[in-house]
């Protein structure tokens, strides 16, 4: 039996901030969103981070790096640094909030996250000014971690 015949798909809920504002997913690959840089993608490719469909779990799927997961997954940091990604949104717009989805990531989810943004048409550099949109916050495993943005 192929692992594609036994798939568990999660049910996702649209956050209140998105329902109320009629928000569009600015991080959608269909709009042209692109991941410019990631600190590591050993266990899960960056391309799995921007899927429009809800995450899926295949109990018996493995690849060259171990258990296949439907999301971006890094090796654990041992050098004191942080894992990060730089995402270019698919369109300019007002950000209503974020959904950091850890569905099916139970012991391998990030414990915390912080989200910063910049408005630029160029690739960010060391001198780029970043603005905090979501302060460092705890992230729950196997969940939609939703963070509305108020400013």
What are these regions, as identified by a protein language model?
Residues 2-84, 105-151:
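Trp- and acidic/polar-enriched beta-sheet ligand-binding modules for extracellular glycan
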Residues 85-87, 96:
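General structural concept
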Residues 89-91:
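A short glycine/threonine-centered beta-strand motif
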Residues 93-104:
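A short beta-strand element within beta-rich, extracytoplasmic domains
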């Amino acid at each position: 039996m192929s692992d594609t015949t036994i798939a568990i798909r999660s049910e996702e809920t649209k956050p209140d901030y998105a329902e109320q504002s009629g928000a569009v997913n600015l991080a959608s690959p269909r709009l042209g969103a692109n991941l410019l840089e990631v600190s590591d993608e050993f266990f899960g490719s960056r391309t799995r981070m921007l899927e429009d469909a809800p995450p899926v779990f295949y109990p018996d799927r493995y690849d060259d790096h171990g258990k296949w997961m439907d999301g971006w997954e890094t090796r654990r940091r041992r050098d004191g640094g942080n894992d990060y990604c730089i995402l270019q949104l698919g369109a300019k717009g007002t950000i209503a909030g974020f959904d950091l989805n850890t569905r099916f990531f139970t012991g391998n989810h990030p414990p915390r996250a912080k989200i910063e943004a910049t408005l630029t048409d160029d690739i960010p550099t060391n001198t780029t000014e970043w603005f905090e949109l979501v302060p460092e916050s705890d992230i729950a495993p196997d969940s939609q971690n939703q963070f509305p943005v108020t400013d």
